[in-house]
A protein has these predicted regions:
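Leucine-rich repeat
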Residues: 64-69, 88-93, 111-116, 134-139, ...
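Eukaryotic tandem repeat interaction scaffolds
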Residues: 143-204, 211
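Consensus "Asn ladder" position of solenoid repeat domains
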Residues: 78, 101, 121-124, 144-147, ...
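Leucine-rich repeat domain C-terminal region
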Residues: 193, 205-221, 228-262
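N-terminal capping/linker segments that flank leucine-rich repeat
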Residues: 2-72, 82, 239-241, 245-262
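Mid-chain, structured segments of secreted extracytoplasmic proteins
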Residues: 70-102
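Canonical leucine-rich repeat
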Residues: 57-60, 65, 83, 106, ...
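Conserved hydrophobic beta-strand positions in leucine-rich repeat
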Residues: 48-50, 71-75, 94-98, 116-121, ...
């Protein structure tokens, strides 16, 4: 009965938008509180969601989790300034949420999670992306919204499997040059940054891009050549100061198959 209740609670939270839903199976063993964790065989837990727990999560709380069974871990909204060291021993982890903590940096230990495909660090105080993150080569989904990033290092070109990157509400003044190396990228969000221009390569270097969002950036012109963006399904330029003639040009260049939001 307890296991059913935990799974039901997790499902309700997911429906409410508390968690991102990316292929999470519904029939796995899920725990959603520290109280439940204390009364559970930890070696059987597949999904552990401790978002907003009543007290800080410590290494002792994570003791006994199976490094081959646990796949998803949510340690969001816990006022963490440092990630518990036990996390980096969970070698089977595929998804890690560290949303709205007090992290000033992306932990250098992230590459110690060889199966990690999803990393969510939204709403922290991160000012830079370390070169060490280039070792997390299985990453497909990276969220760094609402931080204090000004740039991304070229070393991140090693992240060849990235499909979705979200960098909304940072301090970027240009599209990071490393983005052009992420040729498998399907979804890129740079909303509400101080980006004033879009590099010419963005129109040609990302053949698999389906969604591009630059909403709220002070951009007045898109690249002259947009031929490489014909695979787009959605382009958001809402609240960008594009002159009317530029709006007409972009619409004509991309055609009717792209939903363009101005």
């Amino acid at each position: 009965m307890k296991n059913c209740l935990f799974t039901l609670v997790a499902a309700c939270l997911a429906c409410a938008g508390c968690f991102d839903n990316h292929n999470r199976p519904a029939d796995v063993f899920t725990v959603t509180s520290l109280d439940a964790l204390a009364n559970t065989n930890r070696a059987e837990i597949v999904r552990l969601f401790l978002r907003g727990a009543a007290r800080p999560v410590t290494d002792a709380d994570l003791e006994g989790l199976s490094d081959s069974v646990l796949q998803q871990l949510d340690l969001s909204e816990l006022n963490l300034e440092k990630v518990p060291g036990k996390v980096w021993g969970l070698k089977g982890l595929t998804s890690l949420w560290l949303v709205r903590n007090k992290l000033a940096a992306i932990p250098d230990e992230v590459p110690q999670l060889p199966a990690l495909t999803y990393l969510n660090l939204d709403g922290n105080q991160i000012t830079a992306v370390p070169d060490s993150l280039s070792g997390a080569t299985k990453l497909r989904w990276l969220r760094l919204n609402e931080n204090k990033l000004r740039e991304s290092p070229p070393s991140l070109s090693a992240l060849k499997d990235l499909r979705r990157v979200y960098l909304r509400k940072n301090l970027l003044t240009s599209v990071p040059e490393v983005v052009r190396e992420w040729t498998e990228l399907e979804d890129l969000a740079l909303d509400d940054n101080a980006i004033t221009s879009v590099p010419d390569w963005l129109g040609t270097a990302l053949p698999n891009l389906k969604s591009l969002s630059l909403k709220g950036c002070p951009i007045s012109r898109m690249p002259d050549d947009l031929s490489g963006l014909r695979g787009l399904t959605t382009l958001s330029l809402a609240n960008c100061p594009l002159p009317s003639e530029e709006v007409v040009r972009v619409r004509k260049a991309l055609g009717d198959n792209v939903a363009i939001l101005f």
